[in-house]
Curated annotation (Swiss-Prot):
It is found in: Cytoplasm; Cell inner membrane. Residues 146-148 are annotated as: G5. The lineage of its organism: Bacteria, Pseudomonadati, Campylobacterota, Epsilonproteobacteria, Campylobacterales. It comes from Campylobacter curvus (strain 525.92). GO terms for biological process: ribosomal small subunit assembly. Residues 10-17 are annotated as: G1. Residues 57-60 are annotated as: G3. This is GTPase Era. Keywords: Cell inner membrane, Cell membrane, Cytoplasm, GTP-binding, Membrane, Nucleotide-binding, Ribosome biogenesis, RNA-binding, rRNA-binding. Monomer.
Length: 289
């Protein structure tokens, strides 16, 4: 019996959260085509035959001087030391530079290199890309192609991961999907809805606080606050006649309902907290770093 923690590392938009959701066969992690949508670690628990893998989805590695982004990067780097093993995700469309930057961080734990989005390229291009990464074969334990669209890729990856786990009793009940508080998952789903319905800087200068969750017979009531930096942002989040916040609510409710399988009532308020994304204390309290 093996059990351990595996951090999912990669640049922004490499497909880390999509991979976690695919392995869980359930959506619990925020997914967006916009960069840096993942701000918090989230754990997903996967059983592979008799072994238990606790995946830790992390913010994407990137370069920024902004306080919020620096804290996100620190969270990802810290997870590299707190785990038993890692998987580094590299898109098949990218060159090897992001992986080289990861190696320059001098990771101490063993890692598997996962090539994502392989369904989007020809076999010839995939083989060419794998040959490029073979130059680093002394650094990784395995090079595994992966596609979230094809389940046949999952078992080989899980088997390789389990080889790196220590002999250990299960950390969690095998029936558990995640140990992440449901409030945090709901919060991320609402944030995903903001990313999908608003553009420019607004999603990056906004966050969400889930203030209260009330479970009743047949319905879960969620009361949440969207926090943003400027009055103009608040107006745009609400939209003309409340149309934008209505779309955000519909999008978020659908995500939450798909996870909980129950009727959802979602009440969203919007408040302005000027400079929150530049205040380390506020960020740590809000996001949980």
């Amino acid at each position: 019996m093996r059990s351990g923690f595996v951090s999912i590392i990669g640049r922004t938009n490499a497909g880390k959260s999509s991979l976690l959701n695919a392995l869980l066969n359930e959506k619990i992690a925020i997914v967006s085509h916009k960069q840096n949508a993942t701000r918090r670690k989230i754990n997903g628990i996967v059983m592979n035959e008799g072994d238990q893998i606790i995946f830790v989805d992390t913010p994407g590695l990137h370069e920024s001087e902004k306080i919020l982004n620096k804290l996100m990067i620190n969270e990802a780097v810290k997870s590299m030391g707190d785990c038993d093993a890692m998987i580094f995700i590299a898109s098949v469309h990218d060159d090897t530079s992001d992986y080289e930057k990861f190696l320059n961080l001098n990771p101490k734990k063993p890692h598997i290199l996962v090539l994502s989005k392989v369904d989007e390229v020809s076999n010839e291009k995939l083989l060419k890309k794998m040959m490029q990464y073979q130059n680093f074969q002394s650094r990784f334990t395995a090079l595994v192609p992966f596609s979230i669209k094809k389940q046949s890729y999952q078992k080989p990856l899980l088997d390789e991961i389990c080889k790196l786990l220590p002999e250990h009793a299960y950390f969690y009940d095998p029936q558990f999907l995640t140990d992440t508080n449901e409030k945090e998952i709901f919060r991320d789903f609402i944030l995903e809805a903001i990313y999908e319905n608003l553009s420019d800087e607004i999603p990056y200068l906004s966050d969400v606080s889930v203030d209260k969750v009330v479970e009743k017979a047949g319905i879960t009531e969620i009361f949440a606050t969207i926090i943003t930096e400027k009055d103009t942002h608040k107006s745009m989040i609400i939209g003309k006649n409340g149309e934008t916040i209505k779309r955000i609510g519909i999008f978020a409710r659908k995500l939450i309902k798909n996870l909980t399988n129950c009727k959802i009532y979602l009440k969203l308020d919007v408040v302005v907290k000027r400079g929150w994304s530049k205040d380390e204390k506020i960020i740590k309290k809000l996001i949980g770093y």
